[in-house]
Amino acid sequence: MVALVGDAELDEGNIYECLLEGWKHGLRNTWWVIDYNRQSLDGVVREGLYDRIEKTFATFGWEIVTLKYGALQQAAFEEPGGEALRNWIDKCPNQLYSALTFQGGAAWRKRLLDELGDQGDVTDLIERRSDVELSDLMTNLGGHCLPSILNAFNSIDHDRPVCFIAYTVKGWGLPLAGHKDNHAGLMNPAQMAELQTSMNVRSGREWDWFEGLAQPDDKLQSYLSAVPFNAKGTRRHNAATVPVENFPVISGSDMSTQEGFGKVMLELAKSDSALAERIVTTSPDVTVSTNLGGWVNRRSLFARDEMADIFRDEKVASAQKWIFDPKGQHLELGIAEMNLFLLLGAAGLSHSLFGERLLPV
């Protein structure tokens, strides 16, 4: 599973609920690509955010792959004076880098020469490039460089979760690139027309699939049809509905709805019906006080690996039999309420996502 994540989205608390839950269950085969443009809504992120992101993901067992420099920058670093340029880039504050990006090549040149001084090799490296070439070099970050991205993806040879931190420029290639106000900024008609011309998109053909690309349409379509994402057909699966037979009817003395719910779930847990086999329960707080204890005692808690109930093994008196098992049908979430809603949504869509129907409770 691959997700593209904006760096501003890391402000959301449910991100960290998910990271902790993933660590609990030994999350595998998951990549998050963080679009690290360092701009959030109406401003630029705080200095040092990268370190916090890196350490947080590493704490939960993720591999961190940083895509900071594009191929143009990496080639420039190999030139005489390149190491001095790399050091300047690494030390440049995010706000200054964004402002210079918006101002363009002449501003880059003046700032670099002012701060680096006349150092021979690095001065020559800068002066060999036009303003346009210098701007292209300084904004050639790893997240915009397809060869760098492919090299990073192809370097992964395991199934552990990976966090790719891809440095980018917000609004890259547009007149608003780098400006702190670009989140709500709009290009004017003249700017849109210039962009359209630069991308070889003809008027009236804006919605054509391959408009502006150099390769013939039929060649591009053949390629896209053969890539694994499309070659396997639709990814929207389906599953048969679950028959409901002999649903438990609870009778007897007066009881609360919560107590009645618990008794219904216990009777289902005792049965071998198709309905009971497809139910997955969860609770964002205390499982026992929500009357799911009887269900869990019979259906166990889910975990990738079996874990015994040590209290039970040590003969500590308890009404609960808390055994973890890969076939368990209850997911323990602690008090992670946002995880609850994400789980309910994912389990409810399991027929479409995976071709197996689950009934989340």
State where each predicted segment sits.
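Long, well-ordered, tryptophan-enriched scaffold segments
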Residues: 36-255
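Generic beta-strand/beta-sheet core signal
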Residues: 2-5, 13, 33-35, 65-67, ...
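A short alpha/beta connector and helix-capping loop motif
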Residues: 12-35
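Short glycine-/polar-rich loops that comprise or flank the Walker A/P-loop
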Residues: 26-30, 61, 356-358
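Short, solvent-exposed amphipathic alpha-helical segments in soluble enzyme
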Residues: 17-23, 48-49, 179-182, 270, ...
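Thiamine diphosphate
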Residues: 1-2, 125, 130-140, 147, ...
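Flexible loop/turn segments at secondary-structure boundaries
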Residues: 9-12, 38-42, 72-76, 170-174, ...
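Anion (oxyanion) recognition and catalysis
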Residues: 23-24, 58, 157, 352
